[in-house]
Amino acid sequence: EAETATKSCSGRQANQVSLPKQPASQPRGDPTGPKESKKKVETETETDPVN
């Protein structure tokens, strides 16, 4: 279990470094990143009167 905890910490740091690199490598995705994507969804939901 201790190994898993250490791996989680390392994975988190690697993810933070990979995040900005991923959108640049994947043009089909949002180049702004997942954070911007979430904001977009929130705005769309607020603007949608059906929702």
From Swiss-Prot:
Acetylation by EP300, CREBBP, GCN5L2/GCN5 and PCAF regulates the transactivation activity of Tat. Phosphorylated by EIF2AK2 on serine and threonine residues adjacent to the basic region important for TAR RNA binding and function. Phosphorylation of Tat by EIF2AK2 is dependent on the prior activation of EIF2AK2 by dsRNA. GO terms for cellular component: extracellular region; host cell cytoplasm; host cell nucleolus. It is found in: Host nucleus, Host nucleolus; Host cytoplasm; Secreted. A motif (Cell attachment site) lies at residues 28-30. It comes from the Viruses. Keywords: Acetylation, Activator, AIDS, Apoptosis, Host cytoplasm, Host nucleus, Host-virus interaction, Isopeptide bond, Metal-binding, Methylation, Phosphoprotein, RNA-binding, Secreted, Transcription, Transcription regulation, Ubl conjugation, Zinc. One of its GO terms (molecular function) is RNA binding. Residues 1-51 are annotated as: Disordered. Residues 1-25 have a biased composition (Polar residues). The keyword Zinc applies. Residues 33-43 have a biased composition (Basic and acidic residues). There is a cross-link at K21 (Glycyl lysine isopeptide (Lys-Gly) (interchain with G-Cter in ubiquitin)). The transactivation domain mediates the interaction with CCNT1, GCN5L2, and MDM2. Belongs to the lentiviruses Tat family. Transcriptional activator that increases RNA Pol II processivity, thereby increasing the level of full-length viral transcripts. Recognizes a hairpin structure at the 5'-LTR of the nascent viral mRNAs referred to as the transactivation responsive RNA element (TAR) and recruits the cyclin T1-CDK9 complex (P-TEFb complex) that will in turn hyperphosphorylate the RNA polymerase II to allow efficient elongation. The CDK9 component of P-TEFb and other Tat-activated kinases hyperphosphorylate the C-terminus of RNA Pol II that becomes stabilized and much more processive. Extracellular circulating Tat can be endocytosed by surrounding uninfected cells via the binding to several surface receptors such as CD26, CXCR4, heparan sulfate proteoglycans (HSPG) or LDLR. Neurons are rarely infected, but they internalize Tat via their LDLR. Endosomal low pH allows Tat to cross the endosome membrane to enter the cytosol and eventually further translocate into the nucleus, thereby inducing severe cell dysfunctions ranging from cell activation to cell death. HIV-1 lineages are divided in three main groups, M (for Major), O (for Outlier), and N (for New, or Non-M, Non-O). The vast majority of strains found worldwide belong to the group M. Group O seems to be endemic to and largely confined to Cameroon and neighboring countries in West Central Africa, where these viruses represent a small minority of HIV-1 strains. The group N is represented by a limited number of isolates from Cameroonian persons. The group M is further subdivided in 9 clades or subtypes (A to D, F to H, J and K). Interacts with host CCNT1. Associates with the P-TEFb complex composed at least of Tat, P-TEFb (CDK9 and CCNT1), TAR RNA, RNA Pol II. Recruits the HATs CREBBP, TAF1/TFIID, EP300, PCAF and GCN5L2. Interacts with host KAT5/Tip60; this interaction targets the latter to degradation. Interacts with the host deacetylase SIRT1. Interacts with host capping enzyme RNGTT; this interaction stimulates RNGTT. Binds to host KDR, and to the host integrins ITGAV/ITGB3 and ITGA5/ITGB1. Interacts with host KPNB1/importin beta-1 without previous binding to KPNA1/importin alpha-1. Interacts with EIF2AK2. This is Protein Tat. It comes from Human immunodeficiency virus type 1 group M subtype B (isolate JH32).
